[in-house]
Amino acid sequence: MINETRTTLDQSEVDHFSRIAAEWWNPHGKFRPLHQFNPTRLAYIREKICLELHRDPVSLKPFENLKILDIGCGGGLLCEPMARLGAMVVGADASQTNIEVAKIHAAQNGLSIDYRTTTAEALATEGEQFDIILNMEVVEHVADVNLFIEATAKMLKPQGLMFISTLNRTWKAWGLAIIGAEYILRWLPKGTHNYKKFLKPRELKNLLLQNALTVVDEIGVTYNPLNDSWNRSKDMNVNYLLLAKKS
């Protein structure tokens, strides 16, 4: 049972992203790296869902009848393609401003997405269950990562899939994701990341195992400055992505 006195909410993180919420859908703005990163993670998510859940990869709507939760959805950069692929999508974020931006953009594009201003632990108490949960670039922004994994795992159906993308706690990640991206290249606003919140893959795997989730695949995602693109990699020292299945 989830302890109601604990929270995943880090108000300083919520305030930070609320201040720049208007930038979510600007591919040349403060979320430019995420827009560039998105095609790589989308391709991986689509490929693995089709493989693990035996969906037709060439179908226009391979995710039809699948219920997907994108927790920490921001402005909806993942929710919208999931909806276009046929999924029933719930997008949850602790920032009301983010959710307002997401709702407006979905309406402008004729997409039906269930957006909610809430936290993982609050949503978990409602008893809703999902086939897929996306925890993308969010675990490094929560106040209590143990509670966050516990709450999201609780909402996943047996044999359901959880995708987690985050940053490794290495000097290389500190140098590239914080010093490089925030202070030198100014790709991200200063203060976007806190190195102390970065997780090593083994730490995240242990947390998942404690909540009946087994990692079935893992990849690194690296930036290529020569062609200004993000690609899958064996190098998990900076950005990495885990796929876990619930027993």
From Swiss-Prot:
Pathway stated in the Swiss-Prot or TrEMBL entry: Cofactor biosynthesis; ubiquinone biosynthesis
GO molecular function terms noted in the UniProt entry: 2-polyprenyl-6-hydroxyphenol methylase activity; 3-demethylubiquinol 3-O-methyltransferase activity; polyprenyldihydroxybenzoate methyltransferase activity
Taxonomy, superkingdom: Bacteria
Residues involved in S-adenosyl-L-methionine binding: 41, 72, 93, 136
Catalytic activity of the protein: a 3-demethylubiquinol + S-adenosyl-L-methionine = a ubiquinol + S-adenosyl-L-homocysteine + H(+); a 3-(all-trans-polyprenyl)benzene-1,2-diol + S-adenosyl-L-methionine = a 2-methoxy-6-(all-trans-polyprenyl)phenol + S-adenosyl-L-homocysteine + H(+)
Gene Ontology biological process: methylation
Presence of the UniProt keyword Amino-acid biosynthesis in the record: no
PANTHER family: METHYLTRANSFERASE, UBIQUINONE BIOSYNTHESIS O-METHYLTRANSFERASE, MITOCHONDRIAL
Family assignment from sequence similarity: Belongs to the methyltransferase superfamily. UbiG/COQ3 family.
Primary role: O-methyltransferase that catalyzes the 2 O-methylation steps in the ubiquinone biosynthetic pathway.
Protein name according to UniProt: Ubiquinone biosynthesis O-methyltransferase
UniProt source species: Bartonella henselae (strain ATCC 49882 / DSM 28221 / CCUG 30454 / Houston 1)
Source species taxonomy: Bacteria, Pseudomonadati, Pseudomonadota, Alphaproteobacteria, Hyphomicrobiales
